[in-house]
Amino acid sequence: KTYRFSDEEVKVMQTIANDPRVSGQNEVYLNFALGKAFEDRKNFDLAFSHYAFGNSTKAALVNYDSDNTTKQTEEQIDACDQSLFEKFKNMGNEAADPIFIVGLPRAGSTLLEQILSSHSLVEGTTELPDILTLSGRLRRKGKRQGNKPYPYNLHDLDVKTLRRFGDDYMRDTEIHRTETPFFIDKMPNNFRHIGLIKLILPNAKIIDARRHPMACCFSGFKQLFAEGQFFTYSLEDIGKYYKDYVKLMDHWDRVLPGHVLLIQYED
Protein backbone atom coordinates (compact mmCIF):
# COMPACT_ATOMS: atom_id res chain seq x y z
CA LYS A 1 0.00 0.00 0.00
CA THR A 2 2.77 2.46 0.90
CA TYR A 3 5.52 1.17 -1.40
CA ARG A 4 6.38 3.45 -4.32
CA PHE A 5 7.94 1.86 -7.39
CA SER A 6 11.01 3.54 -8.89
CA ASP A 7 11.07 4.56 -12.56
CA GLU A 8 13.51 1.73 -13.27
CA GLU A 9 11.21 -0.81 -11.61
CA VAL A 10 8.28 0.45 -13.69
CA LYS A 11 10.29 0.04 -16.91
CA VAL A 12 11.25 -3.51 -15.98
CA MET A 13 7.63 -4.40 -15.15
CA GLN A 14 6.42 -2.92 -18.44
CA THR A 15 8.98 -4.96 -20.36
CA ILE A 16 7.94 -8.15 -18.59
CA ALA A 17 4.24 -7.37 -19.03
CA ASN A 18 4.74 -7.06 -22.81
CA ASP A 19 6.37 -10.49 -22.99
CA PRO A 20 3.85 -12.86 -24.65
CA ARG A 21 5.14 -15.69 -22.48
CA VAL A 22 3.74 -13.97 -19.38
CA SER A 23 0.17 -14.99 -18.68
CA GLY A 24 -2.29 -16.04 -16.01
CA GLN A 25 -1.68 -15.05 -12.41
CA ASN A 26 1.72 -13.49 -13.21
CA GLU A 27 -0.02 -11.16 -15.66
CA VAL A 28 -2.48 -10.27 -12.92
CA TYR A 29 0.31 -9.42 -10.46
CA LEU A 30 2.13 -7.24 -12.99
CA ASN A 31 -0.90 -5.23 -14.04
CA PHE A 32 -2.08 -4.54 -10.50
CA ALA A 33 1.45 -3.42 -9.62
CA LEU A 34 1.64 -1.18 -12.70
CA GLY A 35 -1.78 0.23 -11.88
CA LYS A 36 -0.50 1.20 -8.43
CA ALA A 37 2.71 2.63 -9.91
CA PHE A 38 0.92 4.90 -12.38
CA GLU A 39 -1.73 5.91 -9.85
CA ASP A 40 1.07 7.11 -7.55
CA ARG A 41 2.37 9.16 -10.49
CA LYS A 42 -1.14 10.59 -11.06
CA ASN A 43 -1.28 9.07 -14.53
CA PHE A 44 -4.83 7.93 -13.89
CA ASP A 45 -5.71 6.89 -17.44
CA LEU A 46 -2.79 4.47 -17.65
CA ALA A 47 -3.37 3.33 -14.07
CA PHE A 48 -6.99 2.47 -14.80
CA SER A 49 -5.98 0.66 -17.97
CA HIS A 50 -3.68 -1.64 -16.00
CA TYR A 51 -6.19 -2.14 -13.19
CA ALA A 52 -8.89 -3.02 -15.73
CA PHE A 53 -6.65 -5.48 -17.58
CA GLY A 54 -5.48 -7.07 -14.34
CA ASN A 55 -9.05 -7.45 -13.15
CA SER A 56 -10.34 -8.90 -16.41
CA THR A 57 -7.46 -11.39 -16.45
CA LYS A 58 -8.19 -12.39 -12.85
CA ALA A 59 -11.92 -12.67 -13.57
CA ALA A 60 -11.16 -15.19 -16.31
CA LEU A 61 -9.25 -17.32 -13.79
CA VAL A 62 -12.01 -17.52 -11.18
CA ASN A 63 -15.51 -18.90 -11.25
CA TYR A 64 -17.79 -16.12 -10.04
CA ASP A 65 -21.49 -16.01 -10.88
CA SER A 66 -23.18 -12.75 -9.89
CA ASP A 67 -26.62 -14.18 -10.67
CA ASN A 68 -26.04 -16.93 -8.11
CA THR A 69 -25.10 -14.33 -5.50
CA THR A 70 -28.33 -12.45 -6.19
CA LYS A 71 -30.25 -15.73 -5.96
CA GLN A 72 -28.69 -16.47 -2.56
CA THR A 73 -29.59 -12.96 -1.40
CA GLU A 74 -33.22 -13.49 -2.37
CA GLU A 75 -33.22 -16.87 -0.60
CA GLN A 76 -31.97 -15.28 2.64
CA ILE A 77 -34.72 -12.67 2.42
CA ASP A 78 -37.38 -15.27 1.69
CA ALA A 79 -36.29 -17.84 4.29
CA CYS A 80 -35.23 -15.60 7.18
CA ASP A 81 -38.57 -13.98 7.85
CA GLN A 82 -40.10 -12.64 11.04
CA SER A 83 -41.60 -16.01 11.95
CA LEU A 84 -38.16 -17.66 12.04
CA PHE A 85 -36.85 -15.27 14.67
CA GLU A 86 -40.06 -15.37 16.69
CA LYS A 87 -39.93 -19.17 16.70
CA PHE A 88 -36.35 -19.35 17.99
CA LYS A 89 -36.10 -16.15 20.01
CA ASN A 90 -33.19 -16.32 22.51
CA MET A 91 -32.75 -20.07 21.99
CA GLY A 92 -29.03 -20.19 21.14
CA ASN A 93 -25.90 -19.64 23.21
CA GLU A 94 -26.55 -16.60 25.42
CA ALA A 95 -22.97 -15.27 25.36
CA ALA A 96 -22.71 -11.55 24.64
CA ASP A 97 -18.96 -11.70 23.92
CA PRO A 98 -18.91 -11.60 20.10
CA ILE A 99 -18.97 -8.35 18.16
CA PHE A 100 -19.41 -9.01 14.44
CA ILE A 101 -18.23 -6.32 12.03
CA VAL A 102 -19.79 -7.03 8.64
CA GLY A 103 -20.02 -5.34 5.27
CA LEU A 104 -17.92 -5.16 2.14
CA PRO A 105 -14.12 -5.27 1.97
CA ARG A 106 -12.43 -1.86 1.84
CA ALA A 107 -15.32 -0.31 3.80
CA GLY A 108 -13.35 0.59 6.93
CA SER A 109 -13.82 -2.54 9.04
CA THR A 110 -10.14 -2.65 10.03
CA LEU A 111 -10.19 0.96 11.20
CA LEU A 112 -13.39 0.31 13.13
CA GLU A 113 -11.85 -2.77 14.75
CA GLN A 114 -8.79 -0.75 15.78
CA ILE A 115 -10.98 1.90 17.39
CA LEU A 116 -13.10 -0.61 19.29
CA SER A 117 -10.18 -2.79 20.40
CA SER A 118 -8.45 0.23 21.90
CA HIS A 119 -10.97 -0.17 24.73
CA SER A 120 -9.72 -2.36 27.55
CA LEU A 121 -12.84 -4.57 27.45
CA VAL A 122 -12.67 -5.33 23.72
CA GLU A 123 -10.21 -7.53 21.85
CA GLY A 124 -9.62 -7.62 18.12
CA THR A 125 -9.03 -11.01 16.51
CA THR A 126 -9.16 -11.40 12.72
CA GLU A 127 -11.56 -12.42 9.95
CA LEU A 128 -12.73 -15.62 11.60
CA PRO A 129 -14.05 -18.30 9.19
CA ASP A 130 -16.38 -20.05 11.66
CA ILE A 131 -19.74 -18.64 10.52
CA LEU A 132 -18.91 -19.20 6.85
CA THR A 133 -17.84 -22.75 7.69
CA LEU A 134 -21.10 -23.44 9.52
CA SER A 135 -23.21 -21.97 6.72
CA GLY A 136 -21.27 -24.15 4.28
CA ARG A 137 -22.09 -27.24 6.33
CA LEU A 138 -25.77 -26.33 6.36
CA ARG A 139 -25.65 -25.68 2.61
CA ARG A 140 -24.09 -29.08 1.92
CA LYS A 141 -26.65 -30.74 4.19
CA GLY A 142 -29.42 -29.01 2.27
CA LYS A 143 -28.15 -30.44 -1.01
CA ARG A 144 -28.72 -34.00 0.13
CA GLN A 145 -31.78 -35.70 -1.27
CA GLY A 146 -34.96 -34.91 0.60
CA ASN A 147 -33.52 -32.00 2.60
CA LYS A 148 -34.54 -28.36 2.40
CA PRO A 149 -31.75 -26.14 1.03
CA TYR A 150 -29.97 -23.57 3.19
CA PRO A 151 -31.17 -21.14 4.47
CA TYR A 152 -34.67 -22.69 4.38
CA ASN A 153 -33.45 -25.56 6.55
CA LEU A 154 -32.92 -23.10 9.41
CA HIS A 155 -36.64 -23.50 10.10
CA ASP A 156 -36.11 -27.22 10.76
CA LEU A 157 -33.41 -26.80 13.41
CA ASP A 158 -34.27 -27.42 17.05
CA VAL A 159 -33.28 -25.57 20.19
CA LYS A 160 -30.63 -28.14 21.11
CA THR A 161 -28.94 -27.79 17.72
CA LEU A 162 -29.00 -23.99 17.81
CA ARG A 163 -27.39 -23.95 21.22
CA ARG A 164 -24.79 -26.49 20.12
CA PHE A 165 -23.89 -24.36 17.11
CA GLY A 166 -23.49 -21.34 19.38
CA ASP A 167 -21.45 -23.35 21.87
CA ASP A 168 -19.23 -24.62 19.06
CA TYR A 169 -18.59 -21.08 17.83
CA MET A 170 -17.62 -19.85 21.28
CA ARG A 171 -15.34 -22.85 21.87
CA ASP A 172 -13.69 -22.83 18.45
CA THR A 173 -12.88 -19.11 18.62
CA GLU A 174 -11.17 -19.36 22.01
CA ILE A 175 -7.83 -19.92 20.29
CA HIS A 176 -8.03 -16.39 18.85
CA ARG A 177 -8.78 -14.53 22.08
CA THR A 178 -7.86 -14.11 25.73
CA GLU A 179 -10.07 -13.40 28.75
CA THR A 180 -11.23 -10.00 27.50
CA PRO A 181 -15.03 -9.70 27.94
CA PHE A 182 -15.73 -8.87 24.28
CA PHE A 183 -14.01 -9.90 21.05
CA ILE A 184 -14.39 -8.86 17.43
CA ASP A 185 -15.01 -11.12 14.45
CA LYS A 186 -14.51 -8.95 11.37
CA MET A 187 -15.25 -11.40 8.55
CA PRO A 188 -17.07 -8.99 6.19
CA ASN A 189 -19.02 -11.67 4.30
CA ASN A 190 -20.85 -12.62 7.50
CA PHE A 191 -23.47 -10.04 6.49
CA ARG A 192 -24.92 -12.78 4.30
CA HIS A 193 -25.57 -14.93 7.38
CA ILE A 194 -26.85 -12.52 10.01
CA GLY A 195 -29.97 -14.65 10.33
CA LEU A 196 -27.87 -17.66 11.29
CA ILE A 197 -25.77 -15.57 13.68
CA LYS A 198 -28.78 -14.23 15.57
CA LEU A 199 -30.26 -17.73 15.90
CA ILE A 200 -27.17 -19.31 17.44
CA LEU A 201 -25.83 -16.20 19.25
CA PRO A 202 -28.88 -14.03 20.00
CA ASN A 203 -26.94 -11.60 22.22
CA ALA A 204 -24.07 -11.00 19.79
CA LYS A 205 -23.52 -7.42 18.64
CA ILE A 206 -23.49 -6.75 14.90
CA ILE A 207 -22.02 -3.65 13.25
CA ASP A 208 -22.49 -2.85 9.57
CA ALA A 209 -19.36 -1.01 8.38
CA ARG A 210 -20.59 0.85 5.32
CA ARG A 211 -18.83 3.13 2.86
CA HIS A 212 -20.06 5.23 -0.07
CA PRO A 213 -20.60 2.85 -3.02
CA MET A 214 -18.23 4.66 -5.38
CA ALA A 215 -15.37 4.76 -2.88
CA CYS A 216 -15.98 1.24 -1.60
CA CYS A 217 -16.42 -0.41 -4.98
CA PHE A 218 -13.50 1.29 -6.71
CA SER A 219 -11.22 0.60 -3.76
CA GLY A 220 -12.14 -3.07 -4.09
CA PHE A 221 -11.51 -2.94 -7.84
CA LYS A 222 -7.94 -1.71 -7.24
CA GLN A 223 -7.22 -4.36 -4.62
CA LEU A 224 -5.84 -7.77 -5.53
CA PHE A 225 -7.14 -9.92 -2.69
CA ALA A 226 -5.08 -12.82 -1.38
CA GLU A 227 -8.12 -15.08 -1.63
CA GLY A 228 -11.85 -14.89 -2.19
CA GLN A 229 -13.82 -11.70 -2.93
CA PHE A 230 -14.13 -12.79 -6.56
CA PHE A 231 -16.90 -10.27 -7.18
CA THR A 232 -14.34 -7.44 -7.11
CA TYR A 233 -12.77 -8.30 -10.47
CA SER A 234 -15.49 -6.69 -12.56
CA LEU A 235 -17.04 -3.24 -12.11
CA GLU A 236 -20.42 -4.66 -13.10
CA ASP A 237 -20.13 -7.49 -10.59
CA ILE A 238 -19.03 -5.10 -7.83
CA GLY A 239 -22.04 -2.88 -8.49
CA LYS A 240 -24.45 -5.82 -8.39
CA TYR A 241 -22.84 -7.17 -5.22
CA TYR A 242 -23.12 -3.79 -3.46
CA LYS A 243 -26.77 -3.56 -4.48
CA ASP A 244 -27.44 -7.08 -3.14
CA TYR A 245 -25.62 -6.19 0.08
CA VAL A 246 -27.73 -3.08 0.73
CA LYS A 247 -30.92 -4.97 -0.09
CA LEU A 248 -30.06 -7.75 2.36
CA MET A 249 -29.02 -5.34 5.12
CA ASP A 250 -32.34 -3.51 4.68
CA HIS A 251 -34.06 -6.86 5.17
CA TRP A 252 -32.16 -7.57 8.40
CA ASP A 253 -33.22 -4.16 9.68
CA ARG A 254 -36.85 -5.01 8.99
CA VAL A 255 -36.92 -8.45 10.62
CA LEU A 256 -34.33 -7.71 13.33
CA PRO A 257 -34.99 -4.05 14.16
CA GLY A 258 -32.35 -2.53 16.40
CA HIS A 259 -30.02 -5.54 16.18
CA VAL A 260 -27.60 -4.15 13.58
CA LEU A 261 -25.73 -0.88 14.14
CA LEU A 262 -24.88 0.98 10.93
CA ILE A 263 -21.58 2.89 10.98
CA GLN A 264 -21.08 5.07 7.90
CA TYR A 265 -17.39 5.49 7.00
CA GLU A 266 -17.81 9.08 5.83
CA ASP A 267 -19.45 10.15 9.10
Task: Annotate each language-model stretch with its function.
Residues 125, 130-158, 176-267:
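PAPS-dependent sulfotransferase catalytic domain
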Residues 1-177:
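Alpha-helical solenoid repeat scaffolds of the TPR/TPR-like class and their adjacent stem/linker regions
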